[in-house]
């Protein structure tokens, strides 16, 4: 981090050097998690018959073309990270990685929560296939935690708003 960020920026993020490095690594690994959804993979796999056949052993990859625009991958990344209980600040950095922060309502509308279904769940998994997609997310998320030096989601830092903005800028420029 010393090479990429001036001391003044690192101070405003308010994480010690090691935790900042771990956090930046984690964000680099999870910011595109929204691409692990039927909404994103379906159209790509339509052009790749061999990988599609392998994936179709686990999922139908069905999606609704007219609904894809409601779950762009940056928004989907934030929604999935929140679904996985990632701290909201870190999830919002992933959601803003193309320079546009997401609104809380838009994020909530994606997958909802334990008490309420989201409006766009069909963009994330075909009917009856939620467990498959959740297991994919969990595996990628756990890998990112491990590779970044965190042993659990509980070790991830809570960020201040200035830290979120600065880390989003770092992620955008990376």
Model-derived features: where do they sit?
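Accessory nucleic-acid engagement/destabilization modules that flank
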Residues: 1-174
């Amino acid at each position: 981090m010393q090479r990429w960020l001036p001391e003044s920026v690192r101070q405003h993020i308010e994480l010690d050097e090691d935790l900042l490095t771990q956090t930046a690594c984690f964000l680099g690994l999870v910011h595109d998690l929204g691409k692990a959804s039927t909404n994103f993979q379906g159209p790509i796999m339509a052009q790749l018959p061999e990988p599609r056949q392998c994936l179709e052993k686990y999922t139908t990859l069905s999606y609704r073309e007219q609904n894809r625009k409601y779950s762009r991958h940056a928004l989907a990344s934030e929604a999935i990270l929140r679904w996985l209980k990632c701290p909201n600040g870190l999830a919002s950095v992933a959601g803003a990685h193309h320079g546009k922060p997401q609104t809380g309502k838009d994020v909530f509308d994606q997958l909802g929560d334990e008490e309420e279904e989201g409006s766009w769940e069909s963009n994330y998994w075909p009917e009856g296939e939620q467990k498959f997609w959740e297991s994919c997310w969990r595996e990628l998320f756990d890998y990112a935690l491990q590779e970044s030096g965190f042993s659990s989601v509980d070790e991830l830092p809570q960020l201040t708003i200035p830290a979120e903005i600065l880390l989003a800028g770092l992620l955008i420029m990376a």
